[in-house]
Curated annotation (Swiss-Prot):
Gene Ontology MF annotations: zinc ion binding
Major localization listed first in the record, in broad terms: membrane
The protein's name in its UniProt record: Transmembrane protein 163
Disease: Leukodystrophy, hypomyelinating, 25: A form of hypomyelinating leukodystrophy, a group of heterogeneous disorders characterized by persistent deficit of myelin observed on brain imaging. HLD25 is an autosomal dominant form with onset in early infancy and characterized by nystagmus, hypotonia, and delayed global development. Most patients show gradual clinical improvement over time with resolution of the nystagmus in early childhood. Many achieve developmental milestones and may have normal cognition, although some affected individuals may have persistent neurologic deficits.
UniProt source species: Homo sapiens
Length: 289
């Protein structure tokens, strides 16, 4: 009877003492902090991955240029690139037609009204025609839509044209300031200024958008030239209206011409400094031409 009692004592005492630790062991071992620790570890990893991706993307774009390709070759699918190339051609043709008509009108205003800004705008309009023609050459070859070498050659030509046109604009504006030529206002001048300002501004926006998608410095430069044309168109109207109300501010027209000429000159120099070395780097990668 005593062993049985001992067994009963052990059996009665056994369930009371050991099971509680066993029953509480799973909650104690439950991975409560684990889900909290995983989000804490992920942000540093994600941040490191982002930094690595940013550095790799910069190195990758440099590698693309070294191989004669633009960054658009990795962003756009072939049919998308061709679609944007056709849009760039259409915008360039439209720009040539519009700016050529505005150039003729602006030259007429410059001769009839002795306007330095009108002469500067006419020169800039011709520059816009030439730059749009260069963009046409740039995208005339469907296989060269991502060609970095072709892109940089177009930019170098644009830089040279910018320098030559800026010199002509500044010389003409300084001559008008030295001879104290006074601008005149009429309906024809008003119409040319409004049309040139609006149309060139619209063309500039379109070229900037296409240049960003195609990663084309030539298109962006062409857009900058159109933007300058829009500013010059409005400046003709501004200087004429100011002179109409205050004849003492006769120098505003020539001063704007000098400022715009210097701006174009600075942009042309910057373009040549950036693009001439790249033409040399990519001269061996004309695979798409």
């Amino acid at each position: 009877m005593e062993p049985a009692a001992g067994i009963q004592r052990r059996s009665s005492q056994g369930p009371t003492v050991p099971p509680p630790p066993r029953g509480h062991a799973p909650p104690a071992a439950a991975p409560g902090p684990a889900p909290l620790s995983s989000p804490v570890r992920e942000p540093p990893q994600l941040e490191e991955e982002r930094q690595v991706r940013i550095s790799e993307s910069g190195q990758f774009s440099d590698g693309l240029e070294d191989r004669g390709l633009l960054e658009s070759s990795t962003r756009l699918k072939p049919h998308e690139a061709q679609n944007y190339r056709k849009k760039a051609l259409w915008v360039s043709w439209f720009s040539i037609i519009v700016t050529l008509a505005l150039a003729v009108a602006a030259f007429t205003v410059s001769v009839m009204r002795y306007s330095a800004s009108a002469f500067g705008f006419a020169f800039d309009a011709i520059l816009d025609v030439l730059s749009s023609a260069i963009v046409l050459w740039r995208y005339s070859n469907a296989a060269a839509v991502h060609s970095a070498h072709r892109e940089y050659i177009a930019c170098v030509i644009l830089g040279v044209i910018f320098l030559l046109s800026s010199i002509c604009i500044v010389v003409k504006a300084i001559h008008d300031l030295s001879t104290r030529l006074l601008p005149e206002v009429d309906d024809f001048l008003f119409s040319v200024s409004i049309l040139s300002g609006i149309l060139c501004s619209i063309l500039a926006v379109l070229k900037f958008m296409l240049g960003k998608v195609l990663t084309s410095r030539a298109l962006i430069t062409d857009g900058f030239n159109s933007l300058v044309g829009g500013v010059m168109g409005f400046s003709i109207l501004l200087s004429a209206e100011v002179f109409k109300h205050d004849s003492a501010v006769w120098y505003l027209d020539g001063s704007i011409g000098v400022l715009i000429g210097l701006t174009i000159f600075a942009y042309g120099v910057k373009l040549l400094i950036d693009m001439v070395p790249r033409v040399r780097q990519t001269r061996h990668y004309e695979m798409f031409e």
